[in-house]
Amino acid sequence: MLRYNLRIPVQAKKAMGSLAPLRPMKSRFGLRCISDKPNEVFTKLSDDNDPQRDAFFKYSWGSWLANDRQEKEKRTTKFSIEGLTDVINDLHAQSKEKAKSEASEGNIPPPSYNPNLTVSLSHNLSALTLGSLNPNETLRVTAMASIHEGKHHRIYKVDTNADKSFILRIPYATNSEAAISYRLKSEVATMDFADLKLGLKVPKVYCFGANALNPIRQPFILEEHIEGRLLMRDWNPLEDDASDKKAHISKLNKVIDPLSQFQSKLLSVEFNQFGSLYFAKDYPDSEGPAYEGEKNESLKNRWSVGPSVERCFWRQKSALPLDKLMQFVGPWSKSKPMDIVKSLGLLEAENAKSRLALQQTDASPAPIEESILREQVRTFENLAEISSSLFNTKSHVIPNIDSLLKPRLYHPDLDPMNVLLDEKDNSAPYLLDFENTSIKPFILQNSPQFVAYDGPKIYNLEEDVEGYKDLSEAEKVQYQFMYKRTRNQHLWESALNKNFNKLISAVAPPVKLLRSPYVACVERKNDMEYLLVDESLIQLREVWEVFAKNKLVSEKKFPLEYTEEQLQKHSTDLNAFHEQLIKSPFAATQGWIPQDMFENLVKAGILIKDKNGDYTIKQ
């Protein structure tokens, strides 16, 4: 859900501190504004500590049932407006120097590591991209607007007197400084690779800072502003089938096709290692070039493969020292694709052990039952143990197994919410951000979340559902939901078959089942979801013998041992977990509620505040 926040028109004056009104702004996403007649207050551009501007930086798009104040503090993105002006001025100066000493055509300079601890991509800097000023005119920021408070970062639109707008992205402090630094370095390098090597339409990055030591005083990415509308506006996952059996497919494919084409281009390069992409200077320890066969001298050795920034390796790992965590995040040899699974299992087990040690000394920042942590250790060690047996990597039963195991880019957010149709470029789709993009085998890559579906498959309501015509309307709606989710995923897989058919066997049901324990671990969002990893392992146990006979797996005997007592306990715990989810309507969002809904629920007396400031749902 998108809501609008504040806009700061900034008027710089030499003789005195500048004053700037703060007000809500209608966003480029075209949704409703909070107020048509905003109240104005004023702030001095030179006063970074002016309390009048605090609301501009505070998180306002939702509230949490528990620890609301702490969660919002993590998402406060206060930065220096003066510092931002200095950074943009520096980019203009670099652009002028570049114009004076323009390199030969086709030569792309490496990233520039600047004295102010920012990194600029000088090939993206020009009067066309940054705007131009009159002689002796000083660049200044004229207006700013907070246009999106995302799940992991805040997005600001910045206008200047050079008649150009920028996007400033600031990550929330929900991870360690090291995690944010690695993530930003990798994201910018991956966007650069997508632009220069793959020819994808992405926002051009002008500059970034990997930590808060730069003039902006926050980690940031400063990039091109693209005016347009989200592809999400065209996506209706519950679109009814058209009477002609075709029109609805065209509507759905209007969204699926551009995203599938993005995916196929991302998959087109085979890398020399598994991990994530960086600029060569940001990870100089890489063994050789990121990929083979580069003929453009400007791109040779521009990038390297380093530690994976996939979210699962960094999420909720504060109990581990950085040097310990770094032992598990790669990069990994391309000859050992399943080491990614093994490392993730070992990392999660080590994290659970560290949390258990803290819990036993009453030093845990997030208390949890010790029995749950012990169960997590067992589950994740099981995942690590089975990793080398999950796939028979020499099997000819899975077509093109060699291609499925090669290192390829994996974008975790191929989603219509992450694609903008540029109104100035004939509605061309632009893939906006590349957070947590990694390099791993396609056989381990799950379908994008907007089409992913693991429930019962229904391809034809009347043929697959016995007595469908005689069901009640409520029952029909349930089956229609399953059918439409099945249909959408099938359309995505059909697009993969069209755009990159040698990888299509990765969506075969046995292959999906084999990677399911790993996928459950990757997508785990809370402590109790270790049960979903366990459930996937136990399901594999039931079919392992059949898979072994068909040479899908490399071991004849299932590698893990489960006692009847363990199986019974798992079943009981899993049922209790599902019952708790049913009772907790906001469990899927970890207790986060959109602000409008939160305020309405409080007014209606449905959410009750306790003495600790937390909220519970009135029973």
UniProtKB/Swiss-Prot annotation:
One cellular-component annotation, GO: mitochondrion
Q: Predominant location of this chain? A: mitochondrion
Keyword Zinc-finger listed = no
Which residue stretches belong to region Disordered? 95-115
The annotated transit peptide is positioned at 1-34
What InterPro entries does the record point to?
A: Kinase-like_dom_sf, Mito_inheritance_9
Full protein name: Altered inheritance of mitochondria protein 9, mitochondrial
Q: Which organism is it from?
A: Lachancea thermotolerans (strain ATCC 56472 / CBS 6340 / NRRL Y-8284) (Yeast)
